[in-house]
Amino acid sequence: MSTLHVLSHSPFSDTRLSSCLRILGSQDALLLCGDAVYALQPESHPLKALEQKIETLTLFFLAEDLTARNLECPWWATSIDYPAFVELSVRYDKVNSWL
């Protein structure tokens, strides 16, 4: 069963991102939105954790949040808009929002 995991909190304020990365299944995907996109800050531990999963991680970023924080989507991830977020929510069997 595939799950879309959605994180919106800063990776610098708690351990949600690292916890999520530990439990991701092979059919799962991760969408970072809101302050979670700060995981892309250069040289940061969250970015290194994401980069270590490049080969197995299906990763999405909400484009609007990247733009608002002046960050760019890396080549190994996909930047999406809100309509694509809705499509992802339907494509996966479950959606798990890490509140």
Identify what each model region corresponds to.
Residues 3-16, 36-40:
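Short, glycine-rich nucleotide/cofactor-binding loops
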Residues 46-70:
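A glycine-rich helix N-cap at a beta->alpha junction
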Residues 7-10, 34, 64, 99:
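Structural motif
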Residues 27-37:
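A short beta-strand-loop structural module common to alpha/beta enzyme folds
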Residues 12-27:
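Histidine-anchored nucleotide/phosphate-binding helix
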Residues 69-99:
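C-terminal structural segments of small proteins and small subunits
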